[in-house]
Amino acid sequence: FIKHVVYVIKENRTYDQVFGALQRGRGRADLCIFGAEITPNQHKLVSEFVLLDNTYCSGILSADGHQWSTTAFSTDYLEKSFAGFPRSYPDGMGEDGRDALAYSPAGFIWDAAQAKGLTIRNYGEFMMPKVRWRDPAKKGVPPFLACYRTWKGESADVIFESAPAIETIREFSPAGYVGWEMSVPDQARADFFLKELKQFEAQGTFPSLVIVCLPNDHTSGTSPNCPTPAACVADGDLAFGRIVEGLSRSKFWKEMAIFAIEDDPQAGWDHVSGYRTTAFCIGPHVKRGAVVSTQYNTTSLLRTMEQILGIPPMNQFDASATPMFDCFTDQADYAPYQSVPNNIPLDRMNPSPNAIRDPVLRQ
């Protein structure tokens, strides 16, 4: 049976943006901007495992999206903050993202896991970035290319670190894994994760609940000195594929299930609903090559993970959520996943606004 759950939280994509051109699912091709050329691993994963074409985010932006993704809840205070977020933007990604009034009184999924005596590892969720220059005389946040060169081993100019936004996660959240910081490539996150996976294999133990923040499919838009949106999404796709491959080739695979969803769908469009999103259910006990059109949302993923790990619901929302029974089979297939390389250069950068010749686009 399943003993290990890996929960990947990504950033801000809708179903049609990524899978709209897939004929197997309910999509609209003219809304697809990050198709198979940019997201080959995500397309391969939904081909080999299940394509979820009727799954929705519970949140609409990061402030409530990360609360729904980790607590299955959004407080009354947070809902009323949508008038302008006067006190904080409580996504847990920085100093202004810390706000106890936004946190569910029932706690987070890791609190529920701890109460059951389960082991946990949290990579980046509710961890504030402390990315900085190694030279203290240098000021400001290092730009993407400096971080990219540090990841590639071409320099050691940048230090990748983070700190917990919530003190209770410190003991199981490595400071070397950076959560939200778009200057840091998702490849650096995948490298960190896979390095620790090797250590877990050497020890012969793996946590019951693993949470992984992979934020770069959020993109930096068309901001100068940042990768293009396609490069950002390709970065996240490759990192996700590499992590799944590593897990599928580990000794823990036979007792594992991987779930992934966007924290919110804010940045995109969809012909069914602005809340419809990309979601994944992966593992040896998951159906192969199936389309699952059962209606699920963020709380469905949490409810399924809770049932697998024997964790009671945190509140009425996950208690009443539909578990993802339709994704699973009693005929296990232990074949590993083979990731595929990116087609888009990960360091393809946005042009300067001055390079845009069309006066309308320049504005």
Residues of each region from the PLM?
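N-terminal pro-sequences and low-complexity stem/linker regions of secreted or lumenal proteins
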Residues: 1-363
